[in-house]
Amino acid sequence: MNIEIYTDGACSKNPGPGGWAYIMVNKDSKEEICRENGGEKSTTNNRMELMAVIRALKKIKEGAASLADKSGKALDYKSISVHTDSQYVQQGISSWIFNWKKNNWKTASKQPVKNQDLWQELDSLSASIKPEWIWVKGHAGNPLNEACDRLAVEACQKMM
């Protein structure tokens, strides 16, 4: 089975109340496997974007046995793709992170990397799961991206 994960984050006032969400689907059958959302009282949009991906990959890492399709068969995946509308997440994990690690978690301008705690957690999860990272244009009619956006906004509103 091939898994697609759609993620999104939302924040009001940045920093302010925020929400994250993910939807996991079987790419082959298009069947939804699971969805989850949550939030924080004081955060940023970038932290929520990162948290969405981290929570989804943690769900995978918890064990495929905890994820089953509707037939009850445990999840046995061949590949995972993460779809995000956040250039920050997609570029960060696919490109920038290599220099950040090489430079002791400093940016090219020698400043500490923002959200280092989450980037380190995502780096560890990504190294073991090895997902493909795909950027999708937000608010462009992709049904799963739009659904994820609604879930993240809903979680954000609950934090207000």
From Swiss-Prot:
One of its GO terms (cellular component) is cytoplasm. This is Ribonuclease H. Mg(2+) 1 binds at D8, E49, D85. It is an enzyme of class 3 (hydrolase). One of its GO terms (molecular function) is RNA-DNA hybrid ribonuclease activity. Mg(2+) 2 binds at D8, D149. Residues 1-157 form the RNase H type-1 domain. SUPFAM superfamilies: Ribonuclease H-like (SSF53098). GO terms for biological process: DNA replication, removal of RNA primer. The keyword Membrane does not apply. Its cofactor is Mg(2+). The gene is rnhA. Coiled coil: none annotated. Endonuclease that specifically degrades the RNA of RNA-DNA hybrids. Keywords: Cytoplasm, Endonuclease, Hydrolase, Magnesium, Metal-binding, Nuclease. Its EC number is 3.1.26.4. Its main location: cytoplasm. Monomer. Belongs to the RNase H family. It catalyses: Endonucleolytic cleavage to 5'-phosphomonoester. InterPro entries: RNase_H, RNaseH-like_sf, RNaseH_domain, RNaseH_sf, RNaseHI. The keyword Heme does not apply. Binds 1 Mg(2+) ion per subunit. May bind a second metal ion at a regulatory site, or after substrate binding. PANTHER family: RIBONUCLEASE H1.
